[in-house]
Amino acid sequence: MGLPSINIEFYKKAVSFVARSSRGVVLLLLKDSTKTTVINAYTEIEDVVKEDWTADNFRIIDLCFMGHPNKVIVVRAVTKEMGINVDECKQLIENLKFDWFAAPCLSKEEGALFASYFDSQKKKKYKKGKAVLVDQAADSPAVVNFATTNISIVYKGEVITIKPEDYTARIAGLLAGVNIRESSTYKVLKEIVDIKQSKNPDEDIEAGKLIIIFDGEKFKIARGVTSLVT
């Protein structure tokens, strides 16, 4: 009667593997001078001390954890007078291990620099990290081009509007929570109550844009695509 128990053990291990594979690591780059600790690692939102972050940044971290990643590494960006110091921020994250990256604090120009960075990391160093950025048609498997705007969500019982840049943290957390048996396509985003809907979802998807759609009942990821189109 030992064989069934062996099968059960294999099953348990398989379930454990799927659970582990579904829990990737997200790196969030945030502009925040509330505290001085640069690199902060959390395994659940309860680990985060609210007073260590601005209210907006705490909400961004909270949104990320909605996707159930294994860990969220929050890095305080090195700033300069007119934004962040991209080169120094890249040095900060260079040796950190993560699967998904989001940086709501980036300008479009800074986002383009990070898109180029992640693309080159993928090509030259074969690193697996991918970036979720807004309005970055990078044509790269290492960059997700998030392209939905006017996002309204229910958060802590209130309806609020979220900038697409801030919502990249939610998308990164969701992507980190997709296991090897699943796809991010049609993943439901239960907190959303309104968006600016795409006029032509098929064209947007073909153009390498990750968008949110409304199917008449639920808001969900249209298709889990990167910005790669060639």
Name each model-derived stretch.
Residues 1-152:
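Small-residue-rich
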Residues 88-230:
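A glycine- and small-residue-enriched flexible loop/hinge signal that marks low-structured segments
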